[in-house]
Amino acid sequence: MNVTFDLTPPSPSQREALIATLNAEERRILLQHGTEAPFCNRLLDNNQLGTYTCRLCGLPLFHSNAKFKSGTGWPSFFEPYTHTHIRKQHDTSHGMIRTEILCARCNSHLGHLFPDGPPPTYERYCLNSVSLTFIPTGTLLPDQLHRGDNTTYRT
């Protein structure tokens, strides 16, 4: 199913309201490009069918059918919901060279992309659980920005 989502960034007032819903750990990771500890995050062992959306703006980012056990301690996916929903950025922090992945709509930090995933893409999108909200199959996707693009689509 081809569904189009509005990728226009939240207005400053919308962004402020969304940020106000975050706890300190979510702010550290989503806004300050932090990383949660491995093997102790809430979505690592989630095996339910559904869609993983951006914790801040609700944009669909990954589907459960692309999730796999990477053994790294973070939820991992071999492809995004759609490539237009993910923004990639060169990251040289902490003495490493990596590809950071961000939400294409709100620019929240999600995690990193590595070239060591399974077929068919051989990519591993390594995500922070706190960057994501899991929406079970059959549930309406959230519409945090009140744009109406998520309200008619069930996961």
From Swiss-Prot:
The keyword Transport does not apply. GO terms for cellular component: cytoplasm. Residues 15-137 form the MsrB domain. Keywords: Metal-binding, Oxidoreductase, Zinc. The keyword Nuclease does not apply. It catalyses: L-methionyl-[protein] + [thioredoxin]-disulfide + H2O = L-methionyl-(R)-S-oxide-[protein] + [thioredoxin]-dithiol. The active site is at 126 (nucleophile). PROSITE patterns: MSRB. Its EC number is 1.8.4.12. One of its GO terms (biological process) is response to oxidative stress. Zn(2+) binds at residues 54, 57, 103, 106. InterPro entries: Met_Sox_Rdtase_MsrB (IPR028427), Met_Sox_Rdtase_MsrB_dom (IPR002579), Mss4-like_sf (IPR011057). Binds 1 zinc ion per subunit. The zinc ion is important for the structural integrity of the protein. It comes from the Bacteria. It is an enzyme of class 1 (oxidoreductase). GO terms for molecular function: peptide-methionine (R)-S-oxide reductase activity; zinc ion binding. It holds the Pfam family SelR. Its cofactor is Zn(2+). Belongs to the MsrB Met sulfoxide reductase family. HAMAP family: MsrB. This is Peptide methionine sulfoxide reductase MsrB.
